[in-house]
Structure formats: structure tokens, C-alpha cells
Amino acid sequence: MYIGIRTRQEVEVQALTMASHVASLRGWHTALARAEIASLLPMAVVKRLPARRLIQLEGEISPEHMLEAVNCSSGCQALLSHAVLWSTEQPIDSLLKQMSDYIQTHTRTGSVAVRSWKHEGKMEGVSARDLMRKIGGMLSSHGYKIDLEQPEHRLGMVLDAKAGIVACGWMIGTGDDSDGISARRATDRPFFKPVSLDPRLARLAVNLASGPLQKGVTLDLMTGTGGFILEAAVSGREAYGIDLDSEMIEGAQKNLDWAAPVTTASLLLGDATRLLDVLPSDIIHRISGFVLDPPYGRNSQGTLEPTALIRAVLESCYSVAATDAHFVLIVPIHPFGEHAEEALPEDATVELLHGQWSELEACFEQTGWRLLERWVEHVHASLGRLILHAVIVPRD
């Protein structure tokens, strides 16, 4: 049994009114992106909008927290502060009136520009260029200096053609579909193995497990080539990576030096099933995020079969975890098809490549962890990945 996160990710369609904030998501796996931003901004209530790549964030969120979240996020391309939401069912003049009021209410100091981008193709009957020109004119009439090259502030506008929604607000983030993470793809690293994770998924898993940057330590349990710890280090997290194979530790260190030459991240030679014997004493019970992508083709734990290995790791993690720790596990599965818009329902049946789902589920329940959500990533015609998110359950 696992528990879906319903308190922060409500699935009902929200009325299109003045939102607290709107997050614009990249399109590669929107279900995971929603969960990631909820983890990075735990003070926010995340609500669904009719557009698959737009979500509403309610609550008191500081600009500093929003900037930190979008800068380290894998799945969020921008946040629009105190955004205006408009539907094509309304007259276009109502959007312009709302934006006029918005510009007067939400002031900025310094030069500005208007930036627009599209989701799901071209929006019929709405010209992004015309809207940008009119909103830019409003800014100019209120005394703002327009600087298209290096503005100090950007007013973002995203047009979602499929949902018929326009969201506008002062931007935090770039609005780009490209996140820059692909520059660290596995094949470009000094040390490479074919089984290495896509850095987008590695970054997202780290954020999902660890939460806000200052929450605690991130632990990459079987680091291999260092995919998780690289993304944690580049984000500025306090992070440790462990592996029993000295070749992997040496190779991961080369990758770490290449990706993040100035970092506090550290690699340790040791056994993830015996963490109390491996970790520095000052991080015990400060570890808030555990990430694990077990090396099935290279069983570094001797004769343990996959499910027994995961159980032993979960037990070891429980003994060193913070009281609010989270755990993200990625395991290979038989093809499940595309399923990028929603978390898996509780009754969905998945076939693991190694072991049985019922046994893996029991591993979490019996070692002090509660499964929250699970997602599937399509890899190719003969392989998928199951991403599991769990939270620690304090023992009596």
C-alpha cells in the first residue's frame, strides 16, 4: 500500500482568477515535475490547472525561496510571481485590463522586458507579438526603461494553446525548454558507463528526495559514475556518494572534478548496507534525502539478490536518517508505455526486471518507510523505469 500526496497536489481544475504564483513546467515528464516543485517549495500548496504544464502555487513563498527552487529544478522552466491567468473564453480586453492593474500593483525597480513562450503549439486568435507590444507599452507608460538585451526584470507570458490559457507575471527563471543539464550528459563525462542515468532524471530525483537546498544532507547510496552526486553538487547541496567499487569512486571523482570543481560534495568507499560504519559521525541523523539506482548488472553487495539488497539498504538508511527524511528509488521495469502526465494509480500493475513488486513494496513497509507515489519513465521499447518516492515513518 502506498499513500498518494493529495494535500499539496489537488487534482481538481481551479477557477481562473488571480493566482498566488504559477509554475511553468518543462514537457518531458510533467507528473514528476509537479512532485519536484512541491518538494522544493514545501510551504506551497500545489494545485492543478487545466493546462498540463502549468500549476498554481498558493501560500507565503519568499522570492528567495522561489529563485532557489527554479534555479535547481529539473522540471520547472519559470515561476510567474502573483500571476494573472486568462482564458480564451474571455475577451482579450479583460487580459489587458488585468495586466494594467497588475503592473500598477506589482512594481519593480530597474529596466524591464517582456518575454513570451508557447506550450502545445500556436494559440488560435491570439497574437503573442501583439500582446507583448501592448504590455510593453503599458510598462513604458508607467516609466519603466525597456531593455531587450539585459533587463533587470522580465515580465513573462506563457500561452498554452491546448488549454486556451495565458499566464502572465514577473518572471523567476528563464522560460527555456532547455535546462542546461544536458551539458552534463553521461557520454560527455570523463568517466562513463552505458547504464548511466539521464542527468535530468538524476537532478529531479535528488530534488524530490532532498527538498529545499538547506534542508539537510543528500546521500547517493551506490554512486557508480556519480550521476546523482554530480547534480547535487552542481546545485550547491551538501552531498555524499558511496560505492564499494574503488574504480567507481575514482571515476566518479573525475566526473565530480569536471562538473563541479569547487564543491563540498564527498565520495566514500564503503557499503550502503552498513552506513554507520562508513559515514562521518557529524552527518548521522542529518541526512534528509536518499537516492538509489541499484547497479543490477554489477552487484556490488556480493551475493545479495536485488530485493534483499534493497531491504538491507533501506534498513541501513533508517538508522542514519533525519526525522523527516525522504527516499527515492529507481528500478528497471518491463515496458509500461508513456505515462508522463500522472503518477501511477495504486492498482496499476508493474513488472520489475528483477523481483516482484509485492516483495519490493513490502521492503519499504517493513523497514520504516512509507511509499508516497510512484511514476514510470519510458526508456525504449524493451525498458522502462519505476521511480518510487517514500518518507520515513518514526518508530515508537
Regions found by a protein language model. Give the residues of each.
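Class I S-adenosyl-L-methionine-dependent methyltransferase catalytic core
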Residues: 2-74, 78, 119-126, 130, ...
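A broadly used, surface-exposed interaction patch
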Residues: 65-103
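N-terminal cationic-hydrophobic initiation segments that often serve targeting/anchoring roles
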Residues: 103-104, 318
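Phosphate-coordination loops involved in phosphoryl transfer and adenosine-cofactor binding
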Residues: 108-111, 215
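Basic, glycine-rich polyanion-binding accessory segments appended to enzymes
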Residues: 114-117
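Short acidic low-complexity segments
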Residues: 145-151
